[in-house]
Amino acid sequence: MNSRPTPSPFSPVQIGPLTLKNRFIKAATNEGMSAGGVPSKQLVKLHSALVAGGTALTTVAYCAVSDDGRTLPNQLTLSQSSLPHFRALTEGVHQAGGLVSAQITHGGCFTFIRERSTKRPLSASGGFNKIGMMSGMFLKQKMNEADMQQVIRDFAQGARLAREAGFDAVEIHMGHGYLLSQFISPMYNKRRDQYGGSLENRLRFPRRVLRAVLDAVGQEMAVICKYSVTEGARAGNTAEDGAQIARMLEEEGAHLLVLSAGMNAESITTMFGSSFPKENRVQQKNKIIALAMAIQRRTEPTVEFRELYLLEHARKVRAAVKMPLAYLGGAKSLASIERIMAEGFDLVAMGRVLLAENDYVDKLASGASRDSICTACNRCVAMMYTPGGTSCVLNKPGDAELNRQPAGG
């Protein structure tokens, strides 16, 4: 247990140069509200409602730092042309009384985009692209030093564009099987140079990205890293590795770590803490690929949700570092949130709970509610593909008309 005084979850907290009014973060979740690669008015409505409902910092998910860095068509992309739409989003959040973070990312070989500047999707190592089973892109390309330099520049520029757009923080996505995670994970990184082998070597490139972002915006914005504490797969990083990763990111100067888990392809249930309904799966037209994916699904364990399902792993990180940490993973009651604070975590990040109840934080603060209505069914994930974008199935669907309109239009 933590020996420090236990703060109230409703008390302010300092993250780098940023002061949050309380300790609640809306975790990044792909909302499907970015037609044409820019925020829609529905996305502005959602994030404004989240902070109006009490959340101190809301996170806009999956902002690609380049066209090559996209995973999905119509994914949010930070560029000069998209800035007016991002500004409309940040202005809406600020007017609603909250702060907003841009999650900046590069998909690497986890991509459904065939148009790119390289022959194959980039990754830590080349060869067979197992995550390409979902997209039909079966080969990936090993990054060389020039590729790394370009991606580092892209992340730094993405952070500067986020600052110009009015964001208060940037969250570097280092987990879940995207590019930086592909370097960190021994499942993906088979290099034999200074960027492969030991965990220290596998962190070398992600640390360079973090350093470039800190140098670019770290004096004006909070710089956050989200990563998978445990990958939940036999050949992947464990929580003990996750604790070492945290030490290195702390040493490099990150202002906050958001502690997640799992990988999109190998261990999605580790990430979400519960099984996925059949309708949540990507539908594949190629019969051979569809068969391979069906076989993979049959081997997945059935996982029943339990609150704070990642706490055992996150404790190992808390014991390893002194820096601020945000716990993510199954907090859906006041009792769980208070336990997180008592365990020494500085903030709590929530995704599904806040999609179900945008005003859950205010309900907790006023005493109107203790337990979330969220059932952890994971159907909100599939809702990102509907015309109105992500929403909880217990509520009304998102506004399809607003979701067709660019935020800055």
PLM regions: where:
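Flavin-dependent oxidoreductase catalytic cores
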Residues: M1-G409
